[in-house]
Amino acid sequence: MRECRSHDTILVQINPVERQGTPRSARDILNRLNEVSFNAVLLKELRMIAMLRQVAEPGNCEGALWAGMRIHRVTSEEMSLLGASSKLIAEWEFLCKLRDLGRSAAESFLAAHASDIGQRSSYDLDTLLKGV
């Protein structure tokens, strides 16, 4: 944060935080375990940022950086449906599909939140602190 002049951070989330249903097969359980493990670290970091933003003193140089931080999140429903095995696919057609899904997600995000960038967070980190 200290090395960057931008106060906006854009999180491109490709692993879903929640999935419908309960995994039943060993493969599905392992895939979900990998997603939960990755997301646990991400959510811990985001919660830490949310807490720092709440307690930071805006007048303090370091506190001003945290207090002024703006968070945005780009998600894709279609990408969240992809299983863990998709991370091993290196075929050109599939990579082009991922590129197109990413562009579509970015366009949707910008249509909804372009005016937020540079002004305010479009992702409410404080919701992550509920129950903490």
Residue ranges and their predicted role:
Residues 1-132:
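Non-catalytic peripheral regions of patatin-like phospholipases
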